[in-house]
Amino acid sequence: MTPTGGSCPRYDFAPIIDNRKKLSAVGEIGLDFHYAPETAKAQCDLFAAQLELARELNLPVVIHTRDADDATLGVLDESDFHYGIIHCFTGSVPFERQLLDRGFMISISGIVTFRAAENVREAARYAPDDRLLVETDSPFLAPVPMRGNENEPSFLPYTVHFLAEQRKTTAESLALLTTANAENLLTPSPPNSQL
């Protein structure tokens, strides 16, 4: 397991830069307009700076986006940095398609098991094999049948089994596939960063 580095909500990137050789990605970064939409401009500016940092460090990003689909795509397009994961994906298939077209991987959490999450199931079925990941998003969003508990990594098999049924494959095959995808993206490569 290798850590990712994030900075929230400030521009102090020194801890990330100082630890870059230990990191597998920059994040969780991104936009969340759910609770404070009035901070949208500041969030977009910080997100753009974080994407530039990831570019300089030659690291993928782990992106959080909530109630900010258009703004997320806008910042990504302005930065022209399309290398990483959209974590805990809960968007629509059209939004997913735009992210996939830009080169991102889609990570599915325990939300896929929730009764009201048909849009997440549709997105999970749509994602190509080589662009799919699974995650816990611990300590939140425990999958059914553990919903209501604090989430933990040991619950990931519930998500994998459910997702495998949705994709008409076996849990074992899906686990191997998503593990390989994560390793391919997050295994540190020889440094060629500018910092």
Region spans (language model):
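Catalytic metal-binding/acid-base residues of hydrolase active sites
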Residues: 2, 30-32, 66, 105, ...
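Divalent metal-binding pocket/active-site signature
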Residues: 6-102, 122-123, 127, 145-154, ...
